[in-house]
Amino acid sequence: MKPVFVILFLTCIAFTYAESYEDVKEEIKNEVEREIFEDLEEESDVLDSNVREFNDAKPWRFRRAIQRVRWRKVAPYMPFVVKTVGKK
């Protein structure tokens, strides 16, 4: 809710000090763009830190190896493996 109140406050200031409607529109647009860029920078910093933590974790190696398996290539051989294991 804070960004909403900030934008509304800046809008009120813009209305009181603006010379024309076009100036108000331009000022609001600039403020909104600035807020969006700041939020994106913060989110990218958070994502970068999460990626580093995930890549540094050694216990995840097995899970990543399983995720990399091409299941479409392996799936046709699964019934044969199940039959072979079931016979023993």
UniProtKB/Swiss-Prot annotation:
**Residues found modified as Valine amide:** V85
Instruction: Please classify the protein's predominant subcellular localization into one broad category.
Output: secreted
Q: Which residues form the propeptide?
A: 19-57
Tell where it localizes. Secreted; Target cell membrane
> Under the cellular component aspect of Gene Ontology, which terms does the record hold?
extracellular region
Q: Which UniProt keywords apply?
A: Amidation, Antibiotic, Antimicrobial, Immunity, Innate immunity, Membrane, Secreted, Signal, Target cell membrane, Target membrane
| Top-level taxon of origin | Eukaryota
Keyword Zinc set for record: no
Tissue expression summary = Expressed in entodermal epithelium along the body column.
According to the record, the signal peptide region is: 1-18
Family of the protein in this entry: Belongs to the arminin family.
Function noted in UniProt: Antimicrobial peptide with a broad-spectrum antimicrobial activity. Keeps its antibacterial activity under a wide range of salt concentrations that mimic physiological conditions of human blood, which is surprising, since Hydra is an obligate freshwater animal with nearly no salt tolerance. Does not affect red blood cells.
Query: What is the name of this protein?
Result: Arminin 1c
